[in-house]
Amino acid sequence: MYNQVLHDHLDGGLRPSTAKELAKRTNYKPINNVDDVANFFDRSSSTSLEDYLEAFTHTIALMQSYSNLEQIAYEAAADMHQNNINFYESRYAPFYSVNDNLSPKDVITAINSGFKQAENQFGIVSGLIVCGMRHDPDNVKAVAELAIEHKELIIGFDIAGPEFNYLPSMYKDSFLKVKNEGINITIHAGEGDGVHSIQEALDNGAKRIGHGVRIIEDISDDNELGPTA
């Protein structure tokens, strides 16, 4: 059987044991044991997308070196394999890991290296979708340019982060540039904002909607949603 995971966040899937290991290695104080990691992500039951996203600051803090990124990507793909997944698409906001020792391309390369190691060992095929953060228009523009410059290293372009007041149409120029380069577009919409944001995502070239749970509020757009929605 051919099983696929098409929506996953690399910074949301660290093994608790790895988070503890990397926190100790990097002297990151908020994480001292595996329970700390679980407590951060218990926020998934929160009704606030913003509160939930805050938990990711702790995992991103551990993704600041080539070796850490490589390990996390490898383990993410390996864990997918253990769950009988053959094809895995993961997304990450690369500029969250850019620092004096890591360029944006280094971040992408490290993640792809981890994916390739898992592919060589287990046969699972993985690909990276790069995310722009919608509350920072300059970041969205920079990630779009990065995607175009290194389109051979990625499989898609996305925007993520807080949705309210950050509609997809704000970034239409970036979406158009990416689309013109033949890069697939997926957009987070219809969670922190209403169904109108899903329609905007479709209007701006999205082939797939991230989350989209509020479509239930208005199913008038259902004919626009295809098999990859």
Segments (PLM) and residue ranges:
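Metal-cofactor-binding active-site regions of metalloenzymes
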Residues: 1-183, 190-197, 202-203, 207-208, ...
